[in-house]
Amino acid sequence: MFEPIKLSDSIEDGIRKASFKTSDAVCSIQIDIELEGDTIRSLQYTKGCHGNTQGIASLCAGMKAADVIARLSGIDCKARGTSCPDQLARALRQLL
């Protein structure tokens, strides 16, 4: 029900680039992720609370995807059943 939908997934020069449409339950509408192996190289949200999504992206850069999943899974926003951080964890889970 809350799973993000993979829009694209490709590998260029060893960097995996994937885009996901987020659940309608959250303010962001898309997450773009770059992975180098199992490490997050960068990520960017489209829409959402700009300061918060920038903060999430900055904190996650350089982290192992599994560690981000462990920290962000299940975070809820306004009793919606998911959140922008949870959507990232769900998207990363699809990539691992």
Located regions from the model:
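Structured beta-strand/loop patches that form or line metal/cofactor-binding pockets in enzymes
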Residues: 1-36
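Active-site- and interface-proximal helix/loop "cap" or "latch" segments in soluble metabolic
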Residues: 22-30, 34-96
